[in-house]
From Swiss-Prot:
Residues under site feature: Required for ER export: Q501
InterPro entries membership: ConA-like_dom_sf, Intracellular_Lectin-GPT, Lectin_leg
Subunit annotation: Exists both as a covalent disulfide-linked homohexamer, and a complex of three disulfide-linked dimers non-covalently kept together. Interacts with MCFD2. May interact with TMEM115. Interacts with RAB3GAP1 and RAB3GAP2. Interacts with UBXN6. Interacts with SERPINA1/alpha1-antitrypsin. Interacts with BET1.
Tagged with keyword Aminoacyl-tRNA synthetase: no
Key word Transmembrane helix present: yes
Cysteine disulfide links: C190-C230
Gene name in the database record: LMAN1
Residues binding a carbohydrate, per UniProt: S88, D121, N156, H178, G251, G252, L253
Stated name of the protein: Protein ERGIC-53
Cell location: Endoplasmic reticulum-Golgi intermediate compartment membrane; Golgi apparatus membrane; Endoplasmic reticulum membrane
GO cellular component: COPII-coated ER to Golgi transport vesicle; endoplasmic reticulum membrane; endoplasmic reticulum-Golgi intermediate compartment membrane; Golgi membrane
Segments for region (Mediates interaction with RAB3GAP1, RAB3GAP2 and UBXN6): 499-510
UniProt signal peptide: 1-30
Amino acid sequence: MAGSRRRGLQARVRPLFCALLLSLSRFVGGDGVGGDPAAGLPHRRFEYKYSFKGPHLVQSDGTVPFWAHAGNAIPSSDQIRVAPSLKSQRGSVWTKAKAAFENWEVEVTFRVTGRGRIGADGLAIWYTENQGLEGPVFGSADLWNGVGIFFDSFDNDGKKNNPAIVIIGNNGQIHYDHQNDGASQALASCQRDFRNKPYPVRAKIIYYQKTLTVMINNGFTPDKNDYEFCAKVENMIIPAQGHFGVSAATGGLADDHDVLSFLTFQLTEPGKEPPTPDKEISEKEKEKYQEEFEHFQQELDKKKEEFQKGHPDLQGQPAEEIFESVGDRELRQVFEGQNRIHLEIKQLNRQLDMILDEQRRYVSSLTEEISKRGAGMPGQHGQISQQELDTVVKTQHEILRQVNEMKNSMSETVRLVSGMQHPGSAGGVYETAQHFADIKEHLHTVKRDIDNLVQRHMLSNEKPKCPELPPFPSCLSTVHFIIFVVVQTVLFIGYIMYRSQQEAAAKKFF
């Protein structure tokens, strides 16, 4: 009975997965986004001299290899507490050597935890020409030359737009506007809550072909690759050589700002030769490392022999639990199909975010161009008419609305898939079937919205035609209305008189 139920679930997953892939191919097939993802990916090379990760993060003297910490930063074996949960604390950690990468990527894993509903002040990830060991900008120095990604948890300007992630660049001559949270200096931003999450928050910062992109994993799931788009800055010019760093600060309110890992990768464009490896170690160092390896290998063999002598009952037992049954294999395939659907939906959600960002930028630039042409050249011949430009702007707004609707629909689908992965034991089959039906309905909605979006885009140059007004219905005449009011009043007075007589007759018996 259980095997038939699993086969039924698997039969439902396969057509749903095919429908999802069909919808994705129709959406991304036109502009080449859905091509081979590995064709244009850059080559990634891990740079250990600009990275740290636990365990055994610190040495015996309390220092972190290749890094320098300052202020109230506290390194430990598995993390670096950049700023503790005490008032008015500042701390930072910086690479000792400068990085000379044309393109790079960093993955930072951190936690920001506190007992209050509101935190302060926040954490910052830096790439600057010089080290800012201590200062007023999230624990680092002001007037930096480079870029900073600020995880601001306190609302200084009172606009209720925090916690937020803000990208701010500087050429070494601009003071940070701390009172307004750098709103006038921000190149891009997004609102994400990164405090008190069940899992560590992960930030992926990519600088590739002069474009800075920030991806965020909010820490709601243990999936390390569950990133979503946050912000992007094009034509970003940063110093050719610089230091990577992390800083944090507290004010009247205090949070613990812990950095668990900082991983740096050098990126090389496809078609170019990857960077040359570092110089090989000398023969003397090789012999030293070989002796240490042999010593550790002998100790391991000795420990194995001691364990086998002390636990003879654990030897020679058959490992039957290693092999899975037919039912377990079918259930695993069902869950793998669900996970693939979940990942595809996440990918589509990220692409929709990026398209929405591009459309907003295009609409803003088009609106500015319309205002300039309307103010400077109102009577010039040969230009596009104001009505046609308004039609284009309205079409772009309609596209934005359709994309938002698709995004909401995909979010609802993700919620259903997450709930489907934990069905109840008693009514699991019925609830799972119901979830599949809901997911199919949402996928059809997304497909229909995409078709409408394509049709609206093709017909955007045509002039819109207003529909004809329906015939105006006949209204109630004044005479009929007066007659109706008089009849209703007479009936109401008669009812009151009848009720009074009944109450008077009832009082005679008492």
